[in-house]
């Protein structure tokens, strides 16, 4: 168990390709309005930032964090030779490798650096079904939780002696035996890790006490569960959740608004919870999506694009705009898309080196230019 308060990273994947232009809205730009006759947002719609850019109207809670200087907006984020396939683009973001197929994820490699001896099977926790590739790495255990309230291998076994006896039983059942092959031994190790992780995480729910009332939707529930684990102080450093789908080929005005309303409100509740528990400076949140959308609408939505926007939020974040806002001029477009102007791995490198205190080069494969959105000291 880890008693001291440590820095942690929460990664929220905006699955499907978030429309950057209707998130950070260039509402005074004529090209924006001309290109999006059906889905543009006007000056009276947006939450103004600086007289030319505005947040989507449903991002009110994020705007409050922005006003406290706790939101970094990473404009024009992407990678060389953009790929408009959901699967390939997400794979690139997950593995931090844009030129070849990498075997493991950037966060999986990060977990390996944090805990090379696998002493803590809950160093990283995914909230949701399955395991995102970003968290995958050989011999690295990661717990995956659907609902913390019902999570646990033995939720109905309450007595200490009973639980210890049950854990010993499962340990013998999953433990390695002489003469078994490597695959069975690996499965056994994963079984023991899952068993221990389930038992540790199940305790976080009972310890939680807060006056914050979260909404009842998947992203709010996930962030509430993340808060529970943070406050339990069990040594978890990496948290992962997903929100979507942002694949708004049709019905974008309604769907995009609903998604950002849910996420913005959930983040507002999450940071109020952190502040109530004195942890607002210990947690940094990354929001990312695999790509942006095309500059022109298609009638009621937008198709897959390239350059996008990411966000870094937290009490230790130096808020503001980072990366150049992509031009909408025809000569600056990439086949009808906004041009990317900063590599997403620069954001990863900043979070690794400046926030988690981990050398980013072994994880990302080389040096990347870094931002200054993490406060010093």
Where would I find each of the regions flagged by the language model?
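Feature for exported/extracytoplasmic and membrane-associated proteins, marking the mature portion
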Residues: 1-277, 296, 309, 313-377
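Metal-dependent active-site segment of extracytoplasmic phospho-/sulfohydrolases and closely related
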Residues: 267, 271-299, 304
């Amino acid at each position: 168990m880890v008693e001291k308060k440590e820095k942690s990273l929460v990664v929220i994947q905006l699955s499907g390709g978030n429309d950057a232009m209707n998130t950070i809205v260039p509402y005074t730009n004529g090209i924006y309005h001309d290109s999006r006759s059906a889905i543009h947002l006007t000056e009276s719609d947006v939450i103004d930032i600086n007289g030319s850019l505005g947040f989507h109207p449903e991002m009110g809670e994020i705007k409050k964090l922005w006003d406290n200087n706790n939101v970094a907006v990473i404009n024009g984020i992407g990678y060389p030779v953009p790929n408009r396939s959901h699967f390939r683009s997400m794979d690139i973001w997950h593995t931090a490798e844009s030129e070849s197929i990498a075997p493991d994820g950037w966060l999986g490699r990060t977990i390996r650096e944090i805990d090379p001896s696998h002493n803590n099977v809950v160093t990283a926790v995914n909230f949701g079904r399955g395991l995102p590739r970003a968290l995958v790495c050989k011999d690295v255990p990661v717990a995956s939780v659907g609902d913390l309230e019902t999570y646990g291998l033995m939720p109905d076994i309450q007595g200490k002696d009973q639980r210890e006896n049950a854990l010993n039983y499962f340990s013998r059942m999953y433990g390695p035996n002489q003469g078994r092959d490597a695959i069975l031994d690996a499965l056994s190790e994963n079984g023991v890790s899952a068993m221990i992780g389930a038992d540790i995480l199940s305790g976080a729910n009972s310890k939680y006490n807060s006056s914050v009332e979260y909404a009842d939707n998947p992203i709010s529930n996930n962030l509430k569960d993340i808060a529970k684990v943070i406050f339990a102080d069990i040594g978890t450093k990496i948290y992962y959740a997903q929100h979507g789908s942002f694949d708004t080929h049709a019905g974008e005005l309604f769907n995009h608004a609903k998604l950002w309303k849910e996420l913005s409100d959930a983040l507002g509740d999450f940071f109020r919870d952190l502040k109530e528990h004195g942890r607002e400076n210990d947690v940094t949140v990354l929001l990312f999506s695999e790509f942006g959308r095309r500059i022109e609408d298609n009638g009621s939505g937008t198709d897959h694009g390239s350059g996008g926007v990411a966000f870094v939020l937290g009490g230790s974040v130096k808020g503001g705009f980072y990366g150049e806002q992509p031009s909408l001029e025809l000569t600056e477009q990439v086949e009808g898309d906004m041009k990317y102007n900063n590599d997403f791995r620069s954001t990863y490198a900043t979070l690794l080196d400046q926030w988690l205190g981990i050398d980013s080069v072994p994880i990302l494969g080389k040096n990347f230019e870094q931002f200054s959105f993490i406060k010093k000291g």
